[in-house]
């Protein structure tokens, strides 16, 4: 059985640290992609009293949040109109991505005789989604004056927040500042928000009314220097499995698909029942590490869909069937932390955690 063990205490402590850091700004906690792989329901249930909003990517994720908490939920993605009636009935916040969305939402709201809560996404430079910057004020004005929309927020997203010295950050901030000025001229109550984790840590003065710290809440820090208080944030999860078999190789024998790993005489291997079918990175095969009884062991051979093997050498530490295997550590400096795994596989921690699928059990401890 493979288990992602999540520390409730660490999770809640991370959020408290962030709240202290952002001062009076509201906190919108992103729980998209199954709470970055940690499990939406468990994460929401254990944090709803600490945050102001939750944020997700689509309608189906939003419904999972509203099933366990009463906090406002913002959907970042496009509006799927097949779900819009349920979204409106549950007061889920939609993101207006272009001017035409307003008329569509008004028509549906009239039919339901219920107003729609909306945030307007403005494209200030990421050039992916959102209302064009040059059309922002017209769209904001139109939504604000609508009898059927409650314009709750206006937001944008930084394209290069992970590089705090990138000139695009200043360009986007300046554009957003002009939008904030226009918006606040309509109403001081409209929530303006721009920053994700890297945004408010790397750039001063861009917390605005609300921040959206996703990866930071789960315990992953940017590599650039951050405040000493933020350094107290820690990863909240460990991925664990069990040794299910010990095998002994003779010299020249191989293991796994294509037998690319060749053992030495009397080398012992431990078989671990987790593979890329569980969302664990296949690229780790033959180069990753796992922790068994506080000793690091290298993976041996190709990872399969349902399993991997690690070399125990001559097994001088007496690893046995049933011993716990730590595949992802909550200690960032360890060779099997999400940070280290991301470096080994040329990706980011978000990817490592969010691809862990439902074959892995989530357990809050």
From Swiss-Prot:
The keyword Coiled coil does not apply. Pathway: Amino-acid biosynthesis; D-alanine biosynthesis; D-alanine from L-alanine: step 1/1. The active site is at residues 32, 257. GO terms for cellular component: cytosol. CDD domains: PLPDE_III_AR. One of its GO terms (molecular function) is alanine racemase activity. The modification N6-(pyridoxal phosphate)lysine is found at residue 32. Pfam families: Ala_racemase_C, Ala_racemase_N. It catalyses: L-alanine = D-alanine. InterPro entries: Ala_racemase, Ala_racemase/Decarboxylase_C, Ala_racemase_C, Ala_racemase_N, PLP-binding_barrel. Its EC number is 5.1.1.1. Its cofactor is pyridoxal 5'-phosphate. SUPFAM superfamilies: Alanine racemase C-terminal domain-like, PLP-binding barrel. GO terms for biological process: D-alanine biosynthetic process. Substrate binds at residues 128, 305. Keywords: Isomerase, Pyridoxal phosphate. NCBIfam families: alr (TIGR00492). Catalyzes the interconversion of L-alanine and D-alanine. May also act on other amino acids. Belongs to the alanine racemase family. This is Alanine racemase. It comes from Francisella tularensis subsp. tularensis (strain SCHU S4 / Schu 4).
